[in-house]
Amino acid sequence: MVKIVKRIKKIREGINFNELYTLTDAVSMVKERAVAKFDETIEISMNLGVDPRHADQMVRGVAHLPNGTGKNIRVAVFARGDKAEEAKAAGADIVGAEDLFETVNGGTINFDRCIATPDMMPLVGRLGKVLGPRSLMPNPKVGTVTTDIAGAVKASKGGAVEFRVEKAGIVHAGVGKASFGAEQLIENIKTFVSAVIKAKPQGAKSEYIKRVAVSSTMGIGIKVDLVTIRSE
């Protein structure tokens, strides 16, 4: 307990929690404080001026991070025939149809992204109660229901990050690892923020982005000045 308190105190040192830091400074501070024995994930959290209980204020999309996430993404694909072979050739970890349905329906989910061809959706749709709560249900709006299976698999493996606003109006995602260079993280963060801005719904309030913060897995949030994300 004493060690934990000391670690938290050390992480908080030098941070003014009332200040908005430039993106460059915030990334530097987060990296300096990511001292765990594993490669911590660098995360972004955005408070949005939306109420997702209203359909016209839902925020959902996908950001294609130029430098990847640093995570080995396991991809499952629901497809048959040539499309199943296309998925395997593109590097999908799990490919199947009715057999994969039975596996998932039985509670075995050992993948991070789920892709399906349009003809498979009547079957996959029956897995809504299993995949939905885990944000794994394929959706054409984020490119996971598609005939371009190879492209979708490669995008998922290469840094595609899905996002969806939560009940409190918060969007968050991992945008890299502490081992990434500062410029790599900055590029990824800018790309993610741009994707969220592009996903602004018609019903959003005038102040769409209220707060942006970055942190590491074991660290604390450092608030970022949105202007510097757009200008640096």
Curated annotation (Swiss-Prot):
Keywords for this protein: Repressor, Ribonucleoprotein, Ribosomal protein, RNA-binding, rRNA-binding, Translation regulation, tRNA-binding
Superkingdom of source: Bacteria
GO BP, one annotated term: regulation of translation
Gene Ontology annotations for the cellular component aspect, listed alphabetically: cytosolic large ribosomal subunit
InterPro entries assigned to the protein according to its UniProt record, in alphabetical order: Ribosom_uL1_bac-type, Ribosomal_uL1, Ribosomal_uL1-like, Ribosomal_uL1/biogenesis, Ribosomal_uL1_3-a/b-sand
GO molecular-function terms, A-Z: rRNA binding; structural constituent of ribosome; tRNA binding
Keyword Glycoprotein: no
Protein role: Binds directly to 23S rRNA. The L1 stalk is quite mobile in the ribosome, and is involved in E site tRNA release. Protein L1 is also a translational repressor protein, it controls the translation of the L11 operon by binding to its mRNA.
Similarity field: Belongs to the universal ribosomal protein uL1 family.
Subunit organization: Part of the 50S ribosomal subunit.
HAMAP family referenced in this protein's UniProt entry, alphabetically: Ribosomal_uL1_B
UniProt-recorded name of the protein: Large ribosomal subunit protein uL1
Gene (name only): rplA
